[in-house]
């Protein structure tokens, strides 16, 4: 049988871009704890010994931004100067402005041309789900996330004390060309920062035996599966000392690993009035419920918005030939069962809560945590009944 390959990557919480994402979302959560209607667009830059906080924030909350940044860095594991970046010693610069009043009047209810709560910007967002894994996520990104989660677990509990916070993973999966389903794992790449006193051979054996094999399904590993562990041979310098990190630079890691398109808007540091974030979460919720309902084995939804306008400017669905009913019918069901106006999304998914720091590493989707309301399949039964299936 013919097959094709598809690859997705993930990065650990200690990757510099993810450090920035987590600081941005920790600041968002600290603000939402005091002021759930705050407007937040918190951007972060991290580099050797330096954190820069900038963006637009309008709130009555009183937050010690420097303390939040340091505590986030400490939790991730950068707590010694040996790593070139540590929570106590780094400089933190703060430069937040307020949200533009021109934008605010389009988002605030009762202001602007559309008196409903309008979208915070124009843009397009995608949601996706498929039946490749129990959480209805694509196989490669799901397991790429699990690998770096396992790396962090073994680092933090001391079982592999030579591990350091920065790490990356990559899964190449072979798919059956006829069924479109995962067939075998072709290649596993895992690069992890480490202390200088561990040999490459010892590191490779420990990573394969203690990180890779406990995570990946044994039946998907074959004699031909390639394991590429720290393929440069050395990864001592890492984190913000090795690379500058920025909020919003891992948007494919955050979503579907390239298995679905991305509208381009990042998530972290943005309050839910920003449809870049909230509508992408709603898109995942819609797509996952469509697949869970058996309306399709694979579903991609696109929604788009105009700044200041509540109703989406478009809703479209693609099921890649796996649909049980016509796509046009699915779009009708989406409009009946899901309120995709910004305020409707916020209420539907209960988004005015300090839940976002947890989303900022290991993927925003495919994690069935209690806070991740967009992962629920509570609409599936109603969709299936309304579809007549």
From Swiss-Prot:
Keywords assigned: ATP-binding, Cytoplasm, Magnesium, Metal-binding, Nucleotide-binding, One-carbon metabolism, Potassium, Transferase
**Top-level taxon:** Bacteria
The cofactors required by this protein are: Mg(2+); K(+)
State the PROSITE patterns in the record: ADOMET_SYNTHASE_1 (PS00376), ADOMET_SYNTHASE_2 (PS00377)
What pathway, per the record? Amino-acid biosynthesis; S-adenosyl-L-methionine biosynthesis; S-adenosyl-L-methionine from L-methionine: step 1/1
Q: What is its main location?
A: cytoplasm
EC id: 2.5.1.6
Q: Does the keyword Zinc-finger apply?
A: no
Positions bound to Mg(2+)? 17
Locate the region Flexible loop.
99-109
State the free-text cofactor note.
Binds 2 divalent ions per subunit.
Q: Which GO terms describe its cellular component?
A: cytoplasm
Q: Which reaction does it catalyse?
A: L-methionine + ATP + H2O = S-adenosyl-L-methionine + phosphate + diphosphate
Q: Which Pfam families match?
A: S-AdoMet_synt_C, S-AdoMet_synt_M, S-AdoMet_synt_N
Gene Ontology biological-process annotations: one-carbon metabolic process; S-adenosylmethionine biosynthetic process
Protein function: Catalyzes the formation of S-adenosylmethionine (AdoMet) from methionine and ATP. The overall synthetic reaction is composed of two sequential steps, AdoMet formation and the subsequent tripolyphosphate hydrolysis which occurs prior to release of AdoMet from the enzyme.
Q: Which PANTHER family match?
A: S-ADENOSYLMETHIONINE SYNTHETASE
Query: Belongs to which family?
Result: Belongs to the AdoMet synthase family.
- Subunit (UniProt): Homotetramer; dimer of dimers.
**Which protein, by its recorded name, is this?**
S-adenosylmethionine synthase
Which species does the entry assign this protein to? Laribacter hongkongensis (strain HLHK9)
